[in-house]
């Protein structure tokens, strides 16, 4: 894969969240908190299983606005509490598993707030990158709202 192809199939986002790093990290690893903010607008996260340890698995069940239920799953490759998560990402598709990509989320203390930097790489295409970008913006908007006191 060339450098330009790698850049074309990855995305990076940074968001400042009004919460302590430990609390923001927990929002990614505690299933009950996670379900409150995960997903783009109109999507409901109905179940989340999260075993946030190296080699641990996660599986998320989401209901899309049009009613379709989709499943996301992966494995934690790195868990550095409360600084960093690295995990694989794959959609369950047609009874199988779709292409696997990789997500890195870094949590940096910024006074009483937290800078969250997200890198989603190894996406299968530019179209996939664009769809995931839309989803991540919605997720981070919800997370920001939840920590601002306006529950997502």
Task: Tell where the protein language model's regions lie, with residue ranges.
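Hydrophobic ligand-binding cavity/cleft-lining segments
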Residues: 1-44
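Intrinsic-disorder/low-complexity, polar/charged segments enriched in Ser/Thr/Lys/Arg/Asp/Glu/Gln
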Residues: 8-14, 21, 45, 57, ...
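Short beta-edge strand/loop motif at the mouth of beta-sheet-based domains
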Residues: 12-13, 32-69, 151
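Hydrophobic/aromatic beta-strand elements that line small-molecule binding cavities or substrate pockets
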Residues: 15, 48, 72-78, 101-108
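A short, structured loop/turn motif at beta-sheet edges
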Residues: 21-22, 51-53, 77-84, 106-115
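Hydrophobic pocket/interface hotspot
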Residues: 24, 34, 58, 76, ...
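Helix-adjacent hinge/juxtasegments
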Residues: 59-81, 87
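Beta-strand/loop substructures that line and gate deep hydrophobic ligand-binding cavities in soluble
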Residues: 86-137
